[in-house]
């Protein structure tokens, strides 16, 4: 097992002593052109659920947000004169393990996603073991052979401290008491999301984002997995601190990008209360002993971590090796994250998968090609919806003279497509 780096030093590098000595009277946070949400009430509501730890939680949330916004890893997707991704973006991504791309999705695209989300929620099963929705119709995914909905009790942490997902969520997060009128369980992850939402499928083919994927993983980059993360106010579950990668920690070719990355497109924005927190620079440190890190921080409030603070339409790129997690959404703002990731082809070709998102299998050229078809359909669907855009040209398709059409036959072809998620 590869373990490296000075984690305590890493924390000091990014946020100094802010986590312990922040003036909690400074509750209003002004950003840019005041586009960000005022989450003062949510911070108070969240902190209040932590009992004797309320003041510490309040200070942590406030300090984390200030520290996040002080980092130089935020701005629009930019290209240099040669058409390549701007060097400062790649450098900041390498330094911190994440970058916030601002204003990527237009309001029109956000509205498309929102309309799909409303329809999807109406078709969710009424309970984890149900196959019908609230109207008695067959529920979303009732004909699926692959996993789709992941449920949790309100404000719970269903993965932390368990052996699920290969035991990568090593610690259990605090689970606040939810209000009496909340449901017994609620969906908080939808897997295989491109099958269920045309709008998310189109976002998957966003040409600027795919150019970023090419810059980091090469022109023959490979798909990973797609999901929606649903963090409803007063309900949304925690995702305990973890690193996504499971396969290459001991590889002789190990480096900071070997496990790929995820894009996280934010429909409603993301805050210190409802958003993902990341320990900057941790993607370079190998596999981390999270229990020891929590112990040294004296709580689940890991020193030096910062939240992904986003506005509507922003998209984060986050390295899958970075230590990250999220607290239960005890605030008043929802978070809906359209999540999709990509790998280097060399990281998956001939490699046996980790078995988290799909059955463990050795990924050969045939499986990678089959899993990549959804990208071809996504590019075609986006071209139809946004004909004024210059569509992305995916090198493996161009080399094989492949073309795709988004129609009913294509829709049938991606049924249960996530059985081939390239999970490493």
For the regions a protein language model found, what residue spans apply to each?
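Non-heme Fe(II)-dependent double-stranded beta-helix
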Residues: 37-95, 102-241, 247
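Short, structured patches in soluble enzyme cores that scaffold and shape functional sites
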Residues: 227, 232, 243-245, 265-269, ...
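Acidic, His- and aromatic-enriched active-site or binding-groove loops in soluble protein domains
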Residues: 241-260
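Double-stranded beta-helix
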Residues: 257-261, 268-327, 347
């Amino acid at each position: 097992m590869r373990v490296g780096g000075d984690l305590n030093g890493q924390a000091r590098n990014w946020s100094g002593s802010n986590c312990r000595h922040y003036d909690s009277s400074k509750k209003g946070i002004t950003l840019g052109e005041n586009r960000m949400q005022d989450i003062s009430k949510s911070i108070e509501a969240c902190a209040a659920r932590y009992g004797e730890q309320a003041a510490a939680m309040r200070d942590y949330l406030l300090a984390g947000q200030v520290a996040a916004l002080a980092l130089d890893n935020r701005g629009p997707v930019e290209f240099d004169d040669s058409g390549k991704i701007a060097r400062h973006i790649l450098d900041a991504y390498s330094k911190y393990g994440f970058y916030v791309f601002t204003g990527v999705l237009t309001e029109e695209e956000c509205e498309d996603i929102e309309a799909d989300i409303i329809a999807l929620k109406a078709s969710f099963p009424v309970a984890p073991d149900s196959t019908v929705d609230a109207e008695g119709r067959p529920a979303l995914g009732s004909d699926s052979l692959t996993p789709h909905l992941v449920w949790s009790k309100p404000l719970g942490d269903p993965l932390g401290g368990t052996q699920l997902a290969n035991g990568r969520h090593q610690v259990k997060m605090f689970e606040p008491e939810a209000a009496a009128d909340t449901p017994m369980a609620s969906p908080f992850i939808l897997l295989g999301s491109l099958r269920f939402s045309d709008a998310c499928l189109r976002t998957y083919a966003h040409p600027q984002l795919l150019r970023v994927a090419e810059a980091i993983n090469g022109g023959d980059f490979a798909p990973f997995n797609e999901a929606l993360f649903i963090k409803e106010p007063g309900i949304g579950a925690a995702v305990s601190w973890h690193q996504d990668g499971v396969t290459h920690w001991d590889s002789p070719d190990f480096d900071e990008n070997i496990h790929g990355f995820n894009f996280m497109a934010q429909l409603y924005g993301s805050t210190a209360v409802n958003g993902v927190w990341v320990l900057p620079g941790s993607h370079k440190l190998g596999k981390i002993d999270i229990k020891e890190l929590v112990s040294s921080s004296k709580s689940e409030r890991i020193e030096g971590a910062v939240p992904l603070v986003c506005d509507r339409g922003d998209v984060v790129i986050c390295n899958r090796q970075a230590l990250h997690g999220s607290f239960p959404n005890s605030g008043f703002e929802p978070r809906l994250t359209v999540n999709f990731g990509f790998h280097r082809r060399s990281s998956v070709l001939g490699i046996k998968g980790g078995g988290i998102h799909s059955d463990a299998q050795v990924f050969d050229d045939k499986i990678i090609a089959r899993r990549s078809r959804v990208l071809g359909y996504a590019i075609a669907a986006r071209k139809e919806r946004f004909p004024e855009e210059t569509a992305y040209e995916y090198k493996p398709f161009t080399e094989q003279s492949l073309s795709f059409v988004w129609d009913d036959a294509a829709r049938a072809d991606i049924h249960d497509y996530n059985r081939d998620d390239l999970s490493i």
